[in-house]
Amino acid sequence: MYKYLMEINSIEDFKKLNSNEIKVLAEEIRHFLIESVSKTGGHLASNLGVVELTLALHQAFNSPEDKIIWDVGHQAYVHKILTGRRDQFSTLRQYKGLSGFPKRYESEHDQFDTGHSSTSISAAMGLATARDLNKDKYKVIAVIGDGAMTGGMAFEALNHIGQSQKDIIVILNDNEMSISPNVGGLSNYLNKIRTAPIYSKVKDDVEYLISNIPAIGKSVMKTAEKAKDSIKYFFVPGVLFEELGFTYIGPVDGHNYHSLYDVMNRTKNIKGPVLLHVMTTKGKGYTLAEKHPDKYHGVNSFHIETGEPISCNENLSYSEIAGKTLVECAAEDEKIVAITAAMPSGTGLNNFAKKHPERFFDVGIAEQHAATFAAGLAANGFKPFFAVYSTFFQRAYDQVIHDACIQDLPVTYLIDRAGLVGNDGETHHGSLDISFLSCIPNLTFMAPKDGIELSEMVRFAAKHNGPVAIRYPRGHSNMDSQENFSPLALGKGEITYHSGNDVLILALGTFNKMGLEICKDLEENNIFSTLMNPRFIKPMDEELIVEMVQKHKIIYTIEDNSKIGGFGTLVQVLLNDNQILKPVKVCALPDRFIEHGNVEDLYEELGLTKKQIVDQIKKEFSDL
């Protein structure tokens, strides 16, 4: 099945292939990726789109001496295959297996850990500056997608590099046509000339000679520069990058290996910063992914023939529940608007966009802008809901404080993927949001125990006159009858189970379900307990917590946030302020970054399973 792929165990093996063999290898890699990712899950469409780009990159440059940085990093699978990790792909994104992102601990070819968007150009500037300070000569290349270019950080870095004129190559992987390509023979001719080493040298020599002609030299050069700049605005599609100080090359067909290799090889000889614009097709080689690239961006295991997932949960996801409720609220209140930072599908806002297109805003990968944009809307009478993953919400922290909470504006943050998300690992877990949000004045902060409660919290936020954050996990929840649902009230929790006063368990959010199972297991051992659903992280139900703590012998809190600054810590501070000298056992995430893997495996490692907590309580109770 594979003529060349199985012979590649290092970058040196790959470099032995000729161009015709590499074209065959490209198709073998696509077949391998589809087969492999269909079993493990992962980022499929983006990797299928960069096969030829990655092959040309590794032929034209010499990794690891030359430094290649992958923005976001989810498109680095081909890079991993070429650098000796093909035989680990059966463990991709699995517990203790191969990461789905570049990791410095994995390979010397992974120069910089990535996971979030728009960071690669800044990192490249850092590496290039270190290179120049050390008087080294290697190349630094940042590979960034057109989507990531919507992030302001990318342009901050472009601005800095253009001013410094460092030798850095930025490869823009454009798979959405967000920069319109120029066409025609003149464009191709100009690009060919501008990348030719001899042209660069002759151009520099001619400019030097003309500028040194007595009396008229500098005037001639100024006239020539003005003419060149005027023509450039008509014919050069990358004039924006030229104005930032980059030599712009492109667009180049991202699936023509020969063209890519040729232009990359010649780009190495250009002095100063270069932006190479490459046009690719996301999902290339797998028809279903080409037709629906968003659907196949990140996938669970699936059937190759149909593209359908192997396992499917019939319940609604928390994202869908939040989005569905928001649509209903917006039908009742025309001041409600929804905002996403390039993730309408992931955050459950697709239906809102269809139902209320004039009140839906996708701002691109720009969380900082989204947060202040929301505050501006709120300042003028609207009720914005900004749906965002917990890990990406970190990027908007100052805007939440400075632009929304200080002014006490009615902005709601729907914080999706809170807690451990599993296979994407450290860069994607939402393990810090309670720590960094609970300290902000004016912010009301909630965590629902299930889908019904999430829906009610969205409705509560729609009527609340102040900033609100609601955190909820990746996962699904049924929407059974609300017969046992007690209405929400600001700053009030609820008791969801009571069999006695031996142990008090405060189980935050969706851990309340496991808390109920813990209580029932303890009963079988004649240990009787009370289970509380806090609902509000801030303001927490201080009166109920203090009352319950004083009645019980053992106190446990359970959450999926870091132990430092988490909900359990807030409970400890509350008891200390009330001079209650009872120890609180905080079951939370440790003070370290949690690796990738199945969530159940990670909880087992971290001591957060039902059995482990029951065993802890039983031991503590027996020691009383």
Curated annotation (Swiss-Prot):
It is an enzyme of class 2 (transferase). The keyword Protease does not apply. Its cofactor is Mg(2+); thiamine diphosphate. Keywords: Isoprene biosynthesis, Magnesium, Metal-binding, Thiamine biosynthesis, Thiamine pyrophosphate, Transferase. Binds 1 Mg(2+) ion per subunit. Binds 1 thiamine pyrophosphate per subunit. It catalyses: D-glyceraldehyde 3-phosphate + pyruvate + H(+) = 1-deoxy-D-xylulose 5-phosphate + CO2. It holds the Pfam family Transket_pyr. Thiamine diphosphate binds at H74, G115, H116, S117, G147, A148, N175, Y286, E367. One of its GO terms (cellular component) is cytosol. One of its GO terms (biological process) is isopentenyl diphosphate biosynthetic process, methylerythritol 4-phosphate pathway. Its EC number is 2.2.1.7. Pathway: Metabolic intermediate biosynthesis; 1-deoxy-D-xylulose 5-phosphate biosynthesis; 1-deoxy-D-xylulose 5-phosphate from D-glyceraldehyde 3-phosphate and pyruvate: step 1/1. SUPFAM superfamilies: Thiamin diphosphate-binding fold (THDP-binding), TK C-terminal domain-like. GO terms for molecular function: 1-deoxy-D-xylulose-5-phosphate synthase activity; magnesium ion binding; thiamine pyrophosphate binding. Homodimer. This is 1-deoxy-D-xylulose-5-phosphate synthase.
